[in-house]
Amino acid sequence: SVGFKAGVKEYKLTYYTPTYETKDTDILAAFRVTPQPGVPPEEAGAAVAXESSTGTWTTVWTDGLTSLDRYKGRCYHIEPVAGEENQFIAYVAYPLDLFEEGSVTNMFTSIVGNVFGFKALRALRLEDLRIPVAYVKTFQGPPHXIQVERDKLNKYGRPLLXCTIKPKLGLSAKNYGRAVYECPRGXXDFTKDDENVNSQPFMRWRDRFLFCAEAXYEAQTETGEIKGHYLNATAGTNEEMMKRAVFARELGVPIVMHDYLTGGFTANTSLAHYCRDNGLLLHIHRAMHAVIDRQKNHGIHFRVLAKALRMSGGDHIHSGTVVGKLEGERDITLGFVDLLRDGFIEKDRSRGIYFTQDWVXLPGVLPVASGGIHVXHMPALTEIFGDDSVLQFGGGTLGHPWXXRPGAVANRVALEACVQARNEGRDLAXEGNEIIREASKWSPELAAACEVWKEIKFEFEAMDTL
């Protein structure tokens, strides 16, 4: 360089490097970029790399005090999105030194910070991130994960069953505890605080924790199975959240819960560390995710939020149902379900996986299917999610005509029937209805459930396409 030259340079001169060979230690990002009219794709891709790493809008003399070659993000490849006009996937490589170790917060502040408000872009969406092994190893990750959770609960060879307590707001603590007792008494493994339930005037958290712990212990004694209620520790401050987690540990319950997006990654990671140190499982709810991930051309895809949660820490996370009332495309959903559960995931664009991801020793997270599902969906859910999942029926348990306990019985009978049929080699996709019908001959509870929900399906066009 011939010395400092003031003025505005094109981003692509510095930040578009198509010949760059990515390093194993780089964090790689795939952005869906929609440039403003007249902005060439290379310039838009380079602008993203610049604004999310070392660059700014003009040359500054302090650039000479650092080594841009060492620290700059680079846009190393651009491809047009099939079927979309003026939309591109820009691949950006970030040197690992740009990020603080063990901080999802810092990673997101850089990669999805100011750049999303950038004027030269009409819209920007982060589709996927490749987290290098060197960075993965700086995170604790899930407090316990799939195998340890099964060992703690002594439940193997089938998905776990849960029930969200409804009505979500307005019950007193004692009545809430009664509802909590009925579900595991019938046969569900878990009950769940709704994500909106924190500590409101009609039910303060401490009262709820006490009644729920009592309910679960009672059900545990009567059924001989380990039961848990996800006690929601989400709060307005970190200190208050930790106070709730500590009280849960003092009660000896197996699991607490957190809303990781509204609570924030910093709070979530603190809670995950506490949970590992104190033997608590951590259930994660994703309230607010659709604000971030539902638009096709702007925001962050849920697979990135799922990866971030695995790094920050959680043992369960809600991840759509493919069949219920909320959104989720089958292949794409299964793509991020594998990213949550498996140790090594191959690049596969047909499932929306842009990079091969190696999680090395980071434990896996159980995906939770929840939202508008009922017994008639059980064969499909067992088929799609397999054993390592939590199937959560709120209305599908509490809405049973004979109430909550028979509702839980119906779900458990349906689940056991599907698992048995699968283990016998039957095809759940083709024979699902038949399997449920056969089982309902032996279970009046299941027969009553089938009667109520025989034909309800929530079918709309999927919005998330590749």
UniProtKB/Swiss-Prot annotation:
User: Where are the N6,N6,N6-trimethyllysine residues found in this chain?
Assistant: 5
User: Which sequence positions carry the modification called N6-carboxylysine?
Assistant: 192
Which PROSITE patterns does this UniProt record tie to the protein?
RUBISCO_LARGE
- What keywords tag this UniProt record? Calvin cycle, Carbon dioxide fixation, Chloroplast, Lyase, Magnesium, Metal-binding, Methylation, Monooxygenase, Oxidoreductase, Photorespiration, Photosynthesis, Plastid
Pfam families given for it? Answer: RuBisCO_large (PF00016), RuBisCO_large_N (PF02788)
Mention one GO biological process in which this protein takes part, according to its record.
Answer: photorespiration
Q: Which cofactor does it need?
A: Mg(2+)
Q: Add the further remark from the entry.
A: The basic functional RuBisCO is composed of a large chain homodimer in a 'head-to-tail' conformation. In form I RuBisCO this homodimer is arranged in a barrel-like tetramer with the small subunits forming a tetrameric 'cap' on each end of the 'barrel'.
Protein's name in the database: Ribulose bisphosphate carboxylase large chain
